[in-house]
Every structure is written in C-alpha cells, then in structure tokens.
Amino acid sequence: MAMNVLQSPSRPGLGKVSGFFWHNPGLGLFLLLLGPLMWFGIVYFGSLLTLLWQGFYTFDDFTMSVTPELTLANIRALFNPANYDIILRTLTMAVAVTIASAILAFPMAWYMARYTSGKMKAFFYIAVMLPMWASYIVKAYAWTLLLAKDGVAQWFLQHLGLEPLLTAFLTLPAVGGNTLSTSGLGRFLVFLYIWLPFMILPVQAALERLPPSLLQASADLGARPRQTFRYVVLPLAIPGIAAGSIFTFSLTLGDFIVPQLVGPPGYFIGNMVYSQQGAIGNMPMAAAFTLVPIILIALYLAFVKRLGAFDAL
C-alpha cells in the first residue's frame, strides 16, 4: 500500500539562521540573556545607583528643596552621635537575632533531617513555612497584642509564677520597658519569630546532606557525641547556618515596621529612611542612610562567602 509522505516546505532562511547560531553558541546565549540582564541592570542597579547618587545632593532646610549640588554633608552627618546610635542599634539587633535564630534553628533542623521522613517530614516543613504564608503586618500586629499589658504573654507568666522575674527583667535599661510590647526584649522576640523559618530551612538542607556514615565512623573511632558534634557535624553545618544568616541579618537590618510597632522609642535605619523621605522630604539624607545597610550587607556577604554560604543556598 502506497503511503503519502508529507514534506514540510524548505526554509533556507531559517536554516541559515539556525546554522549561524549553531556555530556561534556564545552569541545565542548572549541574546537569550540580554533581556533579563537589561531588566536587572537598568531597573534594579540603575534605580539603586540613582538613589545612592542623590545622597550627595544638597537639601535646603529653609525651602525644603533638593538641589543637585554635590556635597559630602549627608555622609558626614551619618557619623553624628544620634545617627551613629541608630546604626549601632540596628546592627546590634541584627546580630542578636541572627545568633538567636541559629541557636534555636539547629535543634529543629537536626530533628527534621535525622529523625523524620515521609508524612512527618512534610508536617514539619508545613509547620515551619506556615507562618510565612500569613501577612507580615498581621503577624507584627498580632504580637503587639500578645505582648501588651494584661496580654497572653503576661497571663501565661502569671500562671507560671514568673511575673516578678519579668518585672525585674523589664527594669533593665538596655532591654526593658513598661511592658513587653514596649521593651527591647519584645522587639527582639518579634524579629526572632518572623525570621526564624529563614534560618531553619537552610540549616536543615545542610544537615540533610550529612552522610550518616560519617557519624558512625566518628563513633567507631571512639569520639564522644560532643566531639562528633564539634568536629564533624558543626563544620558541615556552617554553610547552612551562614546561608540562613544572610536572610536573618539583612532582613532585620532593613526592617522598619517591627521597630515602629513593637519596642521602646528609637529609630532603626529603615525608620530613619522612611522618616527622612516620607515625612521631611529630605531625599539626600534618606539616600545616605540607605548606603549604610548596603555596605554592611556587602561586608557580611563577603564574610559568609568564605564560610561556603552560597554553596548552601
């Protein structure tokens, strides 16, 4: 039986183009990435550099206007005692939240990686990620109610008989306040709750790659559990901890909503940027303040890169 074979019409022009890109794969890759690179370079880096450049403009306090006269006054103003306190306050909170997140995340990540599987592991994944599905502002407002005077936290401590300890703790000048919701401790707890999942998941992924044979070999060689943790587990988990710390450190450093809702009076860097740009209209000073977290995060990324953080992302 005869069969009719349908042949597509020849397209010599298309074949030449295809052959050209076949012999020049680098050009094809360049054209493929040209659109995303232009978007990333113009929209992201272009707007960022424009913002930073405005940090050298002049702001007239009398007319409340910005003039393109270049000056270093805004950069020098960052080293004023009041602005220096804002930077130090923000940096201290970011470091404290990062360290506490690593300490709290490690046991849960270890249990998820070594002792769960199947449905139980899926349950833990959902439990860790579930708070991330809720609105950020809703979570922050919810914590203001939990930590308020006569709130759930105070009621719980009363029933445990720990209210005198809380009262004594709130009298401390650095972390205390009238209530938990107006204390530095309360602000720290809210930051810790919101950013903790960003630490748990990278640490769990790093521990998941830890071969059980290494733990068995360490035990066979006579190492105690403490020695195994120090010389085997911890070095292999450091890239995951460093990867998680990128999120906790940078997100705390740039946050302005939690410091506005919870904690004692006192600006963070994000609050200062919002205040200078939104309330006062001093865009040069706001741009100068944005330079601070950029430099701090760049230095931190250079540090954690040496710890293998990018390999664990």
Curated annotation (Swiss-Prot):
Sequence ranges on the Cytoplasmic membrane side: 1-25, 114-122, 176-187, 252, 305-313
What name appears for this protein in its UniProt entry?
Answer: Inner membrane ABC transporter permease protein YdcU
Main localisation: membrane
Species name: Escherichia coli (strain K12)
Q: Give the matching PROSITE patterns.
A: ABC_TM1
List, alphabetically, the CDD domains matched. TM_PBP2 (cd06261)
Q: Which gene encodes it?
A: ydcU
Asked whether the UniProt record includes Membrane among its keywords, one would answer yes
Per UniProt, subcellular location reads as:
Cell inner membrane
Leader sequence residues: none
InterPro entries in the record: MetI-like (IPR000515), MetI-like_sf (IPR035906)
Determine if Translocase is one of this entry's keywords.
no
Give the stretches traversing the membrane: 26-46, 93-113, 123-143, 155-175, 188-208, 231-251, 253-273, 284-304
The function of this protein is: Probably part of the ABC transporter complex YdcSTUV. Probably responsible for the translocation of the substrate across the membrane.
What biological-process GO terms show up in the record? transmembrane transport
